[in-house]
C-alpha cells in the first residue's frame, strides 16, 4: 500500500474531526454540514478499502498536521492561502430536498465510473427536473455533492451520488451519469429538464428547453433506445 495514500487518509480523518467540532459548536452553515455528512461516508468507504481504523488514523493525522503547522511560518501560510483558488458551493436543492428519504417502487441501480445512479422505473409520463448541489471552481463544476430528479409534484424519482469507496470524479463523469439518468427516465416517456445552474456550470451554456447537449456516445445510445422502443410498440400493435 502506498504510504502517501495512507497519510492522505489519516490527515483527511483528522480534518474531518476538526470540522465536526466546528459543527458541534454550531459554527457551521448548511453547505458546511452537508459536506461533512458526505465526507463521513467517503471516509468510511476509504477506511474499509484500505483496511484502516478511522479512530487510529485520526490520531496519526493529528500528529502529521501538528508537525506541519509547527514548521510552517505565518508568511508562508498567507502566501499559500492567497495563491489557492477558491471554490463556490451552489445549491439547486433545499436542505429538506437534499436530506429527504425516498423509496423506489421499481428500483434500478447502475454504477457509472465513480458515481452511482438510481432510478425508479415505475415513473411514467411525468415532467421531471434534475437539480443538484455541487461545488464550482473557475466557473466549472468541480465536485458533485448530490443530484436528484423531481416530478412536478415534488416526488424524488432518481438520484446520482458519488460512491464513498471511489472518491474523486471529473466533470465528464458527471455529464455521462446525467446522460444515463436522462435516458433511463425518458425510456418511460418522462420529459426531463436540467436546471439552468447545472447546465451552465457542467456544459457551459443553458438551453431554454432544459436539455444539455449530449455527447456522440450518448446520442447513439439514445437512438438505439428509441429504435428498440418503436419495435416494441409495433409488436404490441
UniProtKB/Swiss-Prot annotation:
Listed under GO cellular component are: host cell cytoplasm; host cell nucleus
| Locations listed in the record | Host nucleus; Host cytoplasm
Motif Nuclear localization signal extends across: 34-38
> Which stretches does the entry tag as region RNA-binding and homodimerization?
1-73
Task: Please provide the record's keywords in A-Z order.
Answer: Eukaryotic host gene expression shutoff by virus, Host cytoplasm, Host gene expression shutoff by virus, Host mRNA suppression by virus, Host nucleus, Host-virus interaction, Inhibition of host innate immune response by virus, Inhibition of host interferon signaling pathway by virus, Inhibition of host PKR by virus, Inhibition of host pre-mRNA processing by virus, Inhibition of host RIG-I by virus, Inhibition of host RLR pathway by virus, Interferon antiviral system evasion, RNA-binding, Ubl conjugation, Viral immunoevasion
Q: Per the record, which residues fall in region PABPN1-binding?
A: 223-230
| Compositionally biased region (Basic residues) | 217-237
Q: Where is this region: Disordered?
A: 205-237
Record Pfam families: Flu_NS1
Location of region: CPSF4-binding: 180-215
Q: Where is this motif: Nuclear export signal?
A: 137-146
PTMs per UniProt: Upon interferon induction, ISGylated via host HERC5; this results in the impairment of NS1 interaction with RNA targets due to its inability to form homodimers and to interact with host EIF2AK2/PKR.
Sorted alphabetically, the Gene Ontology BP terms of this entry are: symbiont-mediated suppression of host cytoplasmic pattern recognition receptor signaling pathway via inhibition of RIG-I activity; symbiont-mediated suppression of host gene expression; symbiont-mediated suppression of host mRNA processing; symbiont-mediated suppression of host PKR/eIFalpha signaling; symbiont-mediated suppression of host type I interferon-mediated signaling pathway
One of the entry's Gene Ontology molecular-function terms is: RNA binding
Could you tell me what this protein does?
Inhibits post-transcriptional processing of cellular pre-mRNA, by binding and inhibiting two cellular proteins that are required for the 3'-end processing of cellular pre-mRNAs: the 30 kDa cleavage and polyadenylation specificity factor/CPSF4 and the poly(A)-binding protein 2/PABPN1. In turn, unprocessed 3' end pre-mRNAs accumulate in the host nucleus and are no longer exported to the cytoplasm. Cellular protein synthesis is thereby shut off very early after virus infection.
* Similarity remark: Belongs to the influenza A viruses NS1 family.
**Summary of subunit composition and partner proteins:** Homodimer. Interacts with host TRIM25 (via coiled coil); this interaction specifically inhibits TRIM25 multimerization and TRIM25-mediated RIGI CARD ubiquitination. Interacts with human EIF2AK2/PKR, CPSF4, IVNS1ABP and PABPN1.
Q: What is known of its domains?
A: The dsRNA-binding region is required for suppression of RNA silencing.
Q: What is this protein called?
A: Non-structural protein 1
Gene name as annotated: NS
Amino acid at each position: 500500500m502506498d504510504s502517501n495514500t495512507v497519510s492522505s487518509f489519516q490527515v483527511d480523518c483528522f480534518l474531518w474531526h476538526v470540522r465536526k467540532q466546528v459543527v458541534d459548536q454550531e459554527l457551521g452553515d448548511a453547505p458546511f454540514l452537508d459536506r461533512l455528512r458526505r465526507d463521513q461516508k467517503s471516509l468510511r468507504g476509504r477506511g474499509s478499502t484500505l483496511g484502516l481504523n478511522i479512530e487510529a488514523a485520526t490520531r496519526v493525522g493529528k500528529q502529521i498536521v501538528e508537525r506541519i503547522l509547527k514548521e510552517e511560518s505565518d508568511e508562508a501560510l498567507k502566501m499559500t492561502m492567497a495563491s489557492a483558488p477558491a471554490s463556490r458551493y451552489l445549491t439547486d436543492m433545499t436542505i429538506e430536498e437534499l436530506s429527504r428519504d425516498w423509496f423506489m417502487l421499481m428500483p434500478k441501480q447502475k454504477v457509472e465510473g465513480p458515481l452511482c445512479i438510481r432510478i425508479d422505473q415505475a415513473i411514467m409520463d411525468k415532467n421531471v427536473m434534475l437539480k443538484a448541489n455541487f461545488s464550482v471552481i473557475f466557473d466549472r463544476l468541480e465536485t458533485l455533492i448530490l443530484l436528484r430528479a423531481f416530478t412536478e409534484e415534488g416526488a424524488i424519482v432518481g438520484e446520482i451520488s458519488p460512491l464513498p469507496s471511489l472518491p474523486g470524479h471529473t466533470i465528464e463523469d458527471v455529464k455521462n451519469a446525467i446522460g444515463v439518468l436522462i435516458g433511463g427516465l425518458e425510456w418511460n416517456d418522462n420529459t426531463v429538464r436540467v436546471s439552468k445552474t447545472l447546465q451552465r456550470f457542467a456544459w457551459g451554456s443553458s438551453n431554454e428547453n432544459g436539455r444539455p447537449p449530449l455527447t456522440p456516445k450518448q446520442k447513439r445510445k439514445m437512438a438505439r433506445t428509441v429504435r428498440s422502443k418503436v419495435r416494441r410498440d409495433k409488436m404490441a400493435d
